[in-house]
Amino acid sequence: KIPENVSYDDAAAASMTLLTSWHMLVGRAKITPGQTVLIMGGGSGVGSFGIQIAKLYNCDVIATASPDKLDKCLELGADFAVDHRKEDWHKEVRAITKELAKKKGEAPGIDVSFDHIGETHWNKQLTLLKYGATLVSCGATTGYDAKTDLRHVFFKGTNILGSTQGTKAELEQGLYWMGQGKIKAAIDSTYSFEQAAEAHTKMLTGKGLFGKILLKPEGA
C-alpha cells in the first residue's frame, strides 16, 4: 500500500529501484550506523536511493558519479561526492576514508561498497575495502566480465554478495520512510506515452540524467 503522502509519481519511480537498494544495503549487506559506505553511480535510480538509505542508517556516505551529478548527490545527503570518470577516482576515495578513520579512531577503508556498475570499476572498489568488508552487487552496466584480483578477497576476508530485487516487506519498509519524508524519489523528467522515443533516447545517452524517467498516460 502506498502511504497517503507519497504521490503516484514518487511511488512509480520508487517501486523497483527503492526495493533493489533497500535489499542491497539492509537485507544483504546489513549496514549499521557509523559504517563508511561507498555508493557507486549515485546519480542512478538505485544509487540515489542508496545514498538516502545509507544516511537513514547514519552511515558516512561517499558517492561516485559523473561531474554533472556530484552536487545532486550531495543534495540527497552524501557526505562526499567523487567523479568516477577520473582514472584515479579511487585514490580520492581512499584519502577521504583516511580522514574519516582519524575522526573515528579506526582503520581506513570502506565497510560496504554498493555496486551496479560492474566491470570498469570492480577491482578498484576491492582495493578500497577494509578487512572483513562487503561488496554487494546488483548489476553490471559497464560489463559483466569483471576481472577479480583474488588477493583483495582472501587476504582481507572480503564478502562479495549478489543481490536482486527484494521482498514485499522490504518495499513496505522503504515506502514507510518515504511517507515519513526521510527518503524521496529522484525524478529526472516526465514524458507522455507519445514521447516515449524521446525518453528512451535520453535514457540511452544518459546525458544530464539524474534518477528516474517517468512515462505517464494522458490525464494521469
What is the role of each PLM region?
Residues 62-65, 72-159:
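Glycine-rich cofactor phosphate-binding loops and adjacent beta1-alpha1 units
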Residues 18-21, 90, 122, 150, ...:
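A general structural signal for well-ordered alpha-helical segments in protein cores
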